[in-house]
Structures are given as structure tokens and as C-alpha cells.
């Protein structure tokens, strides 16, 4: 997350000494010398997988499974508080190495999102947690501008599958599926270290319309594209896989 208002290092250290403090807008506490006191999260996203196409009413939908992975020293955890009819503002909770946590204002918003009856109706999800895009790849292998994007913007943060075991990774789920109560004033979402939130290719809006496209493209998935979450590494939030369109069932160009 890019810095918004700079905070003197001494003030950050004083904030870290508090067990649970809501802070004013600050620079990323997971960057700089003070980060050593924190178990900062880090989100990554795996390359698109299980890719296939589906033709629907003249559209050609390129579908793929997404895997948002928690790979930092601590969990990615958001605390939402209602600020509108179907929206919540959030604070991010970051745990301290010696116990306790700090709470910092986050730029992330939660939206009560409908995903169809087959997938359970509506859930509180993080708005713009990830996006999918297609970029044309030239004969020289250079990746160009975005040509198509997915309509999907909102995602849960949850412990769905434990995808990387380790000493910092809990064996059992800590963060359940997203809340479905539209009247809740507060909710918590998160993904533990070593766990993933995975959406199958057949999920609601898990596609890009590729009708009419021909040639080689980079299918990119980006987590936290707006950089509204505090992480220890902002440079590993994108993955991609090359695909040739029309798609013939195998990645690569």
C-alpha cells in the first residue's frame, strides 16, 4: 500500500507499544525499521489455472481458477464497520511479534455482494481485492496494454485450503467463510499464513469475455490492485499465464 501521510518513526514505535490502537492514516507500517516488531501479512496470487472457455449467448467466456495466497509472517485480517446500506469501511489488524496487535485504517471497503443462488446468495466481500485482465503479447514477447477485463471485483478473505504448511501456519481454519447477514454492523475477514482463498473457474463472474480476440495474450491475475492493504511486499501481487486465442485447451502461445 502506498504511503498516504508520513508518520515519524518515533510515533510509529509509540503506536506499536499500544496493544490495540486505531491509528490515523499512516505510511505502511510493514516497511522500514519498525516492521521488525510486526508479523506483517503478504498476499500473493497463483497463476490462472484450470482454464477453459464457455460459450453463452454469443459470448466466449475464458474461465480460470484463482488462488489468493497468504504468505507473510502474519495473517491478512480486516475488521469492517458499516458506513452505508451495503458497505463497510475497514481497519486492518496487524499482529506484533511479541504478542498483541496494532490496528490501522485501511483503504479497503467491504460490499454486500450477490453471487447467485447456486453459490449461496450474498456475502460481505472485499471490494476490488483482485482483478483479472488480458494483455496482448507482441511477436517480440512484449506484453502490451489491457484489452479485456473480468467483471468480478469482490472477493472474500477466508481460510479455505491450507496450501503451504509451516510453523506460522495454523493447522485448522481461523477465518471462516464470509458473513451473509446484510444487517450486521461489524464483520471480520481474513486469511491465515499458509492458507488460500480459492475460487473455481465455474464460479460467479470468474471469467473474461474473449469473443473476437485472436493471437497471443497474457492472462494476468492481480491481488490488491489498488494497493489499499498493508503488506510486507508490494512487488509480488501479480501472476500471469500466456494463452492463445481462440483457446484450444492448453496454455501457452
Q: Across the structure, where does each feature detected by a protein language model lie?
A:
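Beta-sandwich strand segments
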Residues: 27-32, 37, 74-79, 140-148, ...
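A short tyrosine-centered beta-strand micro-motif
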Residues: 132, 213-223
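Short beta-strand elements
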Residues: 98, 231-253
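Short coil-to-beta strand junction motifs in C2/discoidin
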Residues: 77-130, 150
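Boundary/junction segments of secreted and surface-exposed precursor proteins
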Residues: 25-78, 252-253
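Bacterial N-terminal signal peptides
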Residues: 8-19
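Exoplasmic/lumenal beta-rich domain surfaces
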Residues: 129-130, 138-213, 251-252
Amino acid at each position: 500500500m502506498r504511503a498516504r501521510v508520513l508518520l515519524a518513526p518515533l510515533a510509529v514505535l509509540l503506536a506499536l507499544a499500544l496493544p490495540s490502537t486505531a491509528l490515523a492514516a499512516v505510511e505502511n507500517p510493514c516497511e522500514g525499521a519498525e516492521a521488525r516488531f510486526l508479523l506483517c501479512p503478504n498476499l500473493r496470487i497463483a497463476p490462472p489455472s484450470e482454464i477453459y472457455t464457455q460459450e453463452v449467448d454469443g459470448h466466449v467466456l475464458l474461465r480460470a481458477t484463482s488462488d489468493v495466497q497468504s504468505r507473510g509472517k502474519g495473517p491478512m485480517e480486516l475488521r469492517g464497520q458499516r458506513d452505508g446500506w451495503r458497505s463497510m469501511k475497514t481497519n486492518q489488524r496487524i499482529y506484533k511479534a511479541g504478542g498483541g496487535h496494532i490496528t490501522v485504517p485501511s483503504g479497503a471497503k467491504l460490499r454486500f455482494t450477490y453471487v447467485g443462488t447456486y453459490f449461496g446468495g450474498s456475502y460481505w466481500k472485499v471490494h476490488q481485492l483482485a482483478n483479472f485482465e488480458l494483455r496482448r503479447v507482441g511477436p517480440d514477447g512484449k506484453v502490451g496494454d489491457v484489452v479485456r477485463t473480468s467483471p468480478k471485483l469482490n472477493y472474500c478473505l477466508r481460510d479455505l485450503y491450507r496450501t503451504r504448511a509451516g510453523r506460522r501456519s495454523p493447522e485448522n481454519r481461523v477465518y471462516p467463510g464470509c458473513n451473509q447477514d446484510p444487517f450486521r454492523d461489524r464483520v471480520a475477514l481474513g486469511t491465515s499464513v499458509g492458507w488460500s482463498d480459492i475460487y473455481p473457474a465455474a464460479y460467479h463472474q470468474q471469467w473474461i469475455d474473449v469473443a473476437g480476440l485472436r493471437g497471443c495474450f497474457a492472462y494476468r491475475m492481480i491481488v490488491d490492485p489498488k494497493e489499499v492493504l498493508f503488506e510486507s511486499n508490494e512487488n509480488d501481487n501479480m501472476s500471469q499465464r500466456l494463452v492463445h486465442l481462440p483457446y484450444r485447451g492448453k496454455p501457452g502461445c
